[in-house]
From Swiss-Prot:
HAMAP family tied to this protein: Ribosomal_uL2_B
Phylogenetic lineage: Eukaryota, Viridiplantae, Streptophyta, Embryophyta, Tracheophyta
Provenance organism: Nicotiana tabacum (Common tobacco)
Record's protein name: Large ribosomal subunit protein uL2cz/uL2cy
Keywords: Chloroplast, Plastid, Ribonucleoprotein, Ribosomal protein
GO MF annotation list: rRNA binding; structural constituent of ribosome; transferase activity
Alphabetical list of PROSITE patterns matching this protein: RIBOSOMAL_L2
Localization terms from the record: Plastid, Chloroplast
Length: 274
């Protein structure tokens, strides 16, 4: 990713950066519109995810997470921006005439060929079952349920590692640090997701953040007591508690948020590291 800096003329252009190489020109048969009604609300209209709302209209790109074009070589034609994720996407032209979008693997360029199947080369961008991969392979877009498509390690710069295979299961180290078991028959894509430097970009101004659908974050200590446990007091007052809390009164630091007694508890060998 090439970070482009503008010549200084206003504070927003002075501090902001953009990607000067990747554009967006999606194919009409691989996009569709979505009714933007989220705003962080549930079906009852109650806020369940704070600081969301607004943003520019988006067209959803149909991404091939299943990679079920078996043993048919495809060529990378374009590398495009996707407003629905922080990773880039590639348009693939397959030998049988099929055209699909996939996540852009790090280092892939226009003209490279990819393929998916059971006995394909261990090459960046190729998709194959975990049972056919050697130990230590860097992978992304990993299936949890066979045939459902990749669900793990799909964000920009994400990469997991195959560290063991025993019986019917494979052991993976995920980007979060979690070590868990996956069926060896599940598929994954070789390599790392592209756009590794996404965290190095600077939006430069508040308006760029609002275009992404993200609203301002207000500190609890400047709110009223009715709005937050940290609120209230005369002037600049401390939070008035031994430890910081969430807006709902739960401990804010170190509290585990994962639900208990989930079916996948037995598959997790080591919980994620914070």
């Amino acid at each position: 990713m090439a970070i482009h800096l503008y010549k200084t003329s206003t504070p927003s252009t002075r501090n902001g950066t953009v990607d000067s190489q990747v554009k967006s020109n999606p194919r009409n048969n691989l996009i569709y519109g979505q009714h933007h009604c989220g705003k962080g609300r549930n079906a009852r209209g109650i806020i369940t995810a704070r600081h969301r709302g607004g943003g520019h209209k988006r067209l959803y790109r149909k991404i091939d997470f299943r990679r079920n074009e078996k043993d048919i070589y495809g060529r990378i034609v374009t590398i495009e921006y996707d407003p629905n994720r922080n990773a880039y996407i590639c348009l693939i032209h397959y030998g049988d005439g099929e055209k699909r979008y996939i996540l852009h693997p790090r280092g892939a360029i226009i003209g490279d060929t990819i393929v998916s199947g059971t006995e394909v080369p261990i090459k960046m961008g190729n998709a194959l079952p975990l049972t056919d991969m050697p130990l230590g392979t860097a992978i992304h877009n990993i299936e949890i349920t066979l045939g459902k498509g990749g669900q793990l390690a799909r964000a920009a710069g994400a990469v997991a590692k195959l560290i063991a295979k025993e019986g019917k299961s494979a052991t993976l180290k995920l980007p979060s640090g979690e070590v868990r078991l996956i069926s060896k028959n599940c598929s994954a894509t070789v390599g790392q997701v592209g756009n590794v430097g996404v965290n190095q970009k600077s939006l430069g101004r508040a308006g760029s953040k609002r275009w992404l659908g993200k609203r301002p974050v207000v500190r609890g200590v400047v709110m009223n007591p009715v709005d937050h446990p940290h609120g209230g007091g005369e002037g600049r007052a401390p939070i008035g508690r031994k430890k910081p809390t969430t807006p709902w009164g739960y401990p804010a630091l170190g509290r585990r948020s994962r639900k208990r007694n989930k079916y996948s508890d037995n598959l997790i060998l080591r919980r994620r590291s914070k």
